[in-house]
Amino acid sequence: MLEAYIRERRRQKEILLMTHIVMGYPDFETSMAIVEQMVEAGVDLMELQIPFSEPMADGPVILGANQAALSGGARVERCFEFARQAAAKFDIPFLFMTYYNILFKYGVTPFVNKMADINIKGAIVPDLPPEEGQAYLKAMEEQNLSPIHIFSPRTSNERMDFLASQTRGFVYCVARKGVTGKETRFTEEIAGYLDRCRQATTLPLAVGFGVKDEADIAFLKGKADIAVVGSEMIRVVENQGVEGVGRFIQSLA
């Protein structure tokens, strides 16, 4: 179980690190090299994003990577094969991140069954609220996979309680309202929000949207269980190449 893995790792580390890649960006061979660099540098778990043409939760950096991957031929079946290879090769949990249109076109239950077949441990689908995702949640439960839902600073306490009840593995707490990759100021206001998140659930908390350096991660220690680095990883690849990935991850410790 994903939650059990996270709790075991947390006994060894003050905070875990989850990274994010867009499969097929800049191409599949390079994507696998990036995954390898991340794992060797000590990443604890990883989101594999299936590219989509209109990723509503993502800012310009990840949007651009989605569009480039699609232009390069990153289709769902190819992403499944990539994910299968990654999960077989590396001994960390991999999750899918994508949008409901991808599941709808593939078929929700076949999509979830495929996840189980290739050893993907859970999924983040930002545009699928639990009220509209009963078939998805049922399929995930049947396969013992983790549907991960999202809290934001604007989520009411009552809504947090409900979302947490429909979540397995961990809750993804976005550090601010908006899209990925923008500047986030990690302040006492965010600390108060994370305290609300902690009161809403006993599940581990992951925090993303704007996490980019050692200072951000230091701020999150004691407040969250997992720091999520997404857009900044793409910037590193674009500016420093694959060889910069491991150095960057080690700089976050």
Curated annotation (Swiss-Prot):
It catalyses: (1S,2R)-1-C-(indol-3-yl)glycerol 3-phosphate + L-serine = D-glyceraldehyde 3-phosphate + L-tryptophan + H2O. Keywords: Amino-acid biosynthesis, Aromatic amino acid biosynthesis, Lyase, Tryptophan biosynthesis. One of its GO terms (molecular function) is tryptophan synthase activity. The active site is at E47, D58. It comes from the Bacteria. Pathway: Amino-acid biosynthesis; L-tryptophan biosynthesis; L-tryptophan from chorismate: step 5/5. Its EC number is 4.2.1.20. GO terms for cellular component: cytosol. Tetramer of two alpha and two beta chains. Belongs to the TrpA family. The alpha subunit is responsible for the aldol cleavage of indoleglycerol phosphate to indole and glyceraldehyde 3-phosphate. This is Tryptophan synthase alpha chain. It comes from Desulforapulum autotrophicum (strain ATCC 43914 / DSM 3382 / VKM B-1955 / HRM2) (Desulfobacterium autotrophicum). The lineage of its organism: Bacteria, Pseudomonadati, Thermodesulfobacteriota, Desulfobacteria, Desulfobacterales. The gene is trpA.
